[in-house]
UniProtKB/Swiss-Prot annotation:
Protein name as catalogued: 2-C-methyl-D-erythritol 2,4-cyclodiphosphate synthase
Organism whose genome encodes this protein: Natranaerobius thermophilus (strain ATCC BAA-1301 / DSM 18059 / JW/NM-WN-LF)
Alphabetized UniProt keyword annotations: Isoprene biosynthesis, Lyase, Metal-binding
Pathway: Isoprenoid biosynthesis; isopentenyl diphosphate biosynthesis via DXP pathway; isopentenyl diphosphate from 1-deoxy-D-xylulose 5-phosphate: step 4/6
Keyword Metal-binding: yes
Gene: ispF
Amino-acid positions noted as binding a divalent metal cation in the UniProt annotation, renumbered to this chain: D8, H10, H42
Amino acid sequence: MRIGHGVDVHKLVKGEDLVLGGVQIPSDLGLKGHSDADVLIHAIMDAMLGSLALGDIGKHFPDDDPRYHQIDSKVLLKKTYQLITSYGYQLINLDSTIMAEKPKLAPYIDEMRITISDVLDLYPSQIGIKATTFEKLGFVGSGQGIMAQAVVLMERLY
């Protein structure tokens, strides 16, 4: 068994879409990034890569590579999981937290779980997603950005 932990942060700006867990969230502000800036999926990818000591998403999908400009993070998540399975591991459980002052994310959590489970070909019961605020403290609390953390448990298949 292997455990991995991942964290990602992106700045909120006008003129960008807000995509979290592969789901488009209605919002006046979106996340700025080279890809679609999906902090939740990026944290999950980093956790997966970290579980096998394979570096981080910047190593595998550099932000100066035009192939990844505005790419859907679900595509990168699929590629990351294919890499993990090529090493003989599978995801047993994933737990994650999105930290955002607004918008309220509770109405979208189930859709995120289903979206991620579809990409990874897992059961939604293997995907935990929670949302919380920073109680108006720091960059998240002031609405400057959104942060996500993820922890994964991997099991060797063979």
